[in-house]
Amino acid sequence: MRGGTVQINWHEQQPVLTLDFHPVSRRLATGGSDHDIKIWVIASDDSDKKLPTATYHSSLSSHSSAVNVLRFSPSGENLASGADGGGIIIWKLHSTDDGEAWKVQKTLLFHHKDVLDLQWSQDGAFLVSASVDNSCIVWDAIKGSVQQKLEGHLHYVQGVAWDPLGQYIASLSSDRTCRIYANKPQGKSKNTDRMNFVCQHTLVKAEHQNHDESKPPVRAHLFHDETLPSFFRRLAWSPDGSFLVLPAGLCKYSSEVINTAYVMSRRDLSRPAIQLPGASKAIVAVRFCPVLFKLRGSQSDCFFKLPYRVIFAVATLNSLYVYDTESVAPILIHAGLHYAAITDIAWSSDAKYLAVSSRDCFCTIIEFENEELGLPYNLSGTKELDEGNTNCENMKPLKVDSMEIDAGSSKAKIKASSAAVEVTPSPPVLAQNNILMTKDVAEGNATSENDRPSAVDNMEVDVGENKAKMEVTPVAVQVTAPPVSTKNSASSKPTKKRITPIAIN
């Protein structure tokens, strides 16, 4: 693995707000505050020590304001982009004598204010968008018409995700709620059920155990409020639709506030099943690797009982975590990436590259070696998921040491012996920034507190009627210096936090 910040003029020294890889080729599309969409060709450098290269290919210049989000359709034939002011453009790929060109196919105008996020349906026939006007809109991408308007949020809708199995749409807002809409067709039109999404669950608060056992559990908000310093809360479904990961999570233990992401099991979307704490800054984006991987160990070693491994990236305002469902701890931590907030993340279709965009006008590209993440798994053999039957054993999380977490039951349970259980996650891969390293870190002589694991008090988790005490061993995160910048900015080194996923009420 290698990677770092690619120092080229991405968007005329303007913030890069979004990016996405083409599902077939290694084209990378980026959108920024300069009103343009740019297409880049990503390639590996022959030298082992150099970063991947990004070569400019073309520009798409029909927006008149900042481009906040862009996503390729599953087939790669179309590209949808949303901008300030509420405009959405659907671009279509055309073959030309010079190679290829993207031309405007549809312009979708219905949102009254900025579009912050959007997502294609799995068949590429529909599109859902999220806006500052507090609503989501389901579009017929072929006709360019409004299919349905989803209302209910009381503040900006900053993230939206369409279930790959087509049954759910999830939206996340700065009103501190996540709404899960289920498709309940109302009738038939030309022998085809007309989709109709109805709000099935609204996630607002959850019960957190009080450290003082004499006091009852406290109900607290699950998500950050509108003071979160980001316009984006990009949530995501796993490629198989088995679970949903929500960013912008907030968990309060006594006086300590912990940033977290929530994992939702498809079997029970009314409450989070697992939380991923540990980030020093708020989590703003989640993106799943489109490739599923074969198990490296036995199935009983996995955190989720799935016949394959799912890998996903979680971006905070200043760092990147990569998780594997076969591992409790992150398999990769990349900190100190940028001088300003991270805005979006994207995987290439072959899992070769992971890209990150930032408001500091630059993008980071991480390249993985062949089979570094594992051997690809063919999902076509999983009949239950293909048919949408998710009430199977594959959806039940497995034991983590002496803990058994059942995310699908009405109440998550933790079974443990009366003695404390020591959970020691394997160390994650520590990413190195190839642009510049401080001398102490480069020589392995770092002496700052941030470079040493600190003692962590025993953490009590009370879920349902059973109690489990865990002594969690923190993982040291080595932080290397980012590229030298002439801009004044505060250090983005994250402090050490607990990063072991735990079950919650």
Curated annotation (Swiss-Prot):
General function of this protein: Component of the chromatin assembly factor complex (CAF-1) involved in chromatin assembly following DNA replication and DNA repair. Required for several aspects of development, including apical meristem maintenance by regulating the durations of the S- and G2-phases of the cell cycle through its chromatin assembly activity.
Quaternary structure and partners: Component of the chromatin assembly factor 1 (CAF-1) complex, composed of FSM (FAS1), FAS2 and MSI1.
Chain segments annotated as coiled-coil in the UniProt record: none
Top-level division of the source organism's lineage: Eukaryota
GO cellular component, one term: nucleus
Disulfide-linked positions: none
Principal localisation: nucleus
Protein's GO biological process: DNA replication-dependent chromatin assembly; double-strand break repair via homologous recombination; heterochromatin formation; leaf development; meristem structural organization; nucleosome assembly; pollen development; trichome differentiation
Chain positions covered by the region annotation Disordered: 479-505
Name this polypeptide is given: Chromatin assembly factor 1 subunit FAS2 homolog
Stated family: Belongs to the WD repeat HIR1 family.
Gene3D superfamilies for this protein: YVTN repeat-like/Quinoprotein amine dehydrogenase
Subcellular locations according to the entry: Nucleus
InterPro entries per record: CAF1B_HIR1_beta-prop, Gprotein_B, PTHR15271, WD40/YVTN_repeat-like_dom_sf, WD40_repeat_dom_sf, WD40_rpt
WD repeats: 11-50, 62-101, 110-149, 152-191, 223-268, 278-333, 337-378
